């Protein structure tokens, strides 16, 4: 912690594994308030369905961020969207990017969360002297940030071996258990076409 204000870094637990859902920085050396930030992305899902990829990227960023006690709940959060899309190299990618941006905009409007900033990189292609061309998958990286009321109350992702404790699975999506764009599909060298998404944004915000 170079500045002395780092309240939550990437490594957690006795083994210092990089498990943190979010990063948290204190605003000063004596107070309890701070700023939390978290990331979300779903490039595999976006290959099959650009709209679902955008929704999943926002969802991941938000579900990573909520482990910090946000001062005003979801109203504390602002997002940044970094669009990395091979529009100049691949036919049809302009249309896919439009669908992805619109889906992210619509989803954030329903969640009542603003996206005041972002950036774009629209080449995302590497060309070689022999004519070979490598095209990156269209991806949006969503950064979520918000004010934290108490940096000492950030929930850790480290599990404790306690028989009296319980692990819960909470369904935020109200969707079917789809495998498109999943790690399982990737392990089979596939992408899939049946991609999960969030069916009820209002419930997602409440949860």
Placement of each model-derived feature along the sequence:
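Glycine/proline-enriched, intrinsically flexible loops and inter-domain linkers
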Residues: 1-207
């Amino acid at each position: 912690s170079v500045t002395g204000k780092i309240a939550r870094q990437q490594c957690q637990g006795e083994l210092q594994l990089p498990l943190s859902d979010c990063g948290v920085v204190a605003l000063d050396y004596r107070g309890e308030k701070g700023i939390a930030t978290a990331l979300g992305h779903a490039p595999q899902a976006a290959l099959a369905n650009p709209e679902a990829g955008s929704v999943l990227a926002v969802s991941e960023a938000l579900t990573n961020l909520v482990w910090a006690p946000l001062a005003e709940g979801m109203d504390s959060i602002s997002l940044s969207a970094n669009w990395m899309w091979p529009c100049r190299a691949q036919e049809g990618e302009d249309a896919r990017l439009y669908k992805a941006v619109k889906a992210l905009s619509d989803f954030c409007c329903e969640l009542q969360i603003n996206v005041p900033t972002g950036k774009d990189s629209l080449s995302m292609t590497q060309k070689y002297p022999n004519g070979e061309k490598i095209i990156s998958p269209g991806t949006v990286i969503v950064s979520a940030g918000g004010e934290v009321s108490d940096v000492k109350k950030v929930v850790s992702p480290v599990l404790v071996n306690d028989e009296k404790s319980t692990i819960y699975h909470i369904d935020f999506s109200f969707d079917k258990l789809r495998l498109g764009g999943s790690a399982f599909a990737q392990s089979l060298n596939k992408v899939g076409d049946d991609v999960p998404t969030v069916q009820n944004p209002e419930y997602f915000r409440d949860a």
